[in-house]
Curated annotation (Swiss-Prot):
Protein name per the record: Tumor necrosis factor, alpha-induced protein 8-like protein 2 B
GO biological process assignments: innate immune response; regulation of apoptotic process
Its job: Acts as a negative regulator of innate and adaptive immunity by maintaining immune homeostasis. Negative regulator of Toll-like receptor and T-cell receptor function. Prevents hyperresponsiveness of the immune system and maintains immune homeostasis. Inhibits jun/ap1 and NF-kappa-B activation. Promotes Fas-induced apoptosis.
Paired cysteines (S-S): none
Organism from which the protein derives: Danio rerio
Amino acid sequence: METFSSKDMALKAQKKILSKMATKSMVQMIIDDTSSEILDELYRVSKEYTGNRSEAQKVVKDLIKVVVKIGVLFRHNRFNEEELKLAQNFQKKLRQGAMTAISFHEVDFTFDKTVMSDILTESRDMLLKLVNTHLTTKSHGRINHVFNHYADPELLTQLYNSSGPLKPHLNKICNGLNKLLENGTL
């Protein structure tokens, strides 16, 4: 007997539509102003680092799509108890990453590219495990693309170079992360 669920079909349709329409302007209602500012700075970092506008747009677009899809899954209660625990651990890892990024920024000569890269890699692995049965391999590829890009030790080294061109972007990213931590969003 075939099992059909209109709820599942609606969720699939919503994810499909969101994957086609997940642009910054459409996602404004899902992503707050502070997060949007951080995304803008991440775009600028990627654009300056790669020298490739379309690659920078793709990385940030992939990030937005993943955030929106996970938001849809969460709002539709698609995660079981084990996955919800994993989601909490992922959130803790993100908080740890944000606090580490801020600490490295605020305290001179403390930056360690291996620590930052490892946190991002562990976060990627946790997220892939969380969405393993919920998202397509294409979405898994997006997750890998985003995390592998920002976990690149050379990018991180340039980002934390106190006299480098990416420093102003790091200032704004860390200010935004501080806001998200203070208001409990992250």
